Structures are given as structure tokens and as C-alpha cells.
Amino acid sequence: HKQGDFVLRVGAASVVPNDS
């Protein structure tokens, strides 16, 4: 499920510059 998590992280980073 790393690819899915990666996509979610990229999407979140696109909205929030904070990549917790």
C-alpha cells in the first residue's frame, strides 16, 4: 500500500506544504 500512501502524501503536499 506504499503507492497509495505515496499518492495521498503527494496530494496532501500539493495542498499542505507540511509533510508530517
From Swiss-Prot:
It comes from Vibrio alginolyticus. It is found in: Cell outer membrane. GO terms for cellular component: cell outer membrane. Its main location: membrane. Belongs to the OmpW/AlkL family. It comes from the Bacteria. Keywords: Cell outer membrane, Membrane, Transmembrane, Transmembrane beta strand. This is Outer membrane protein W.
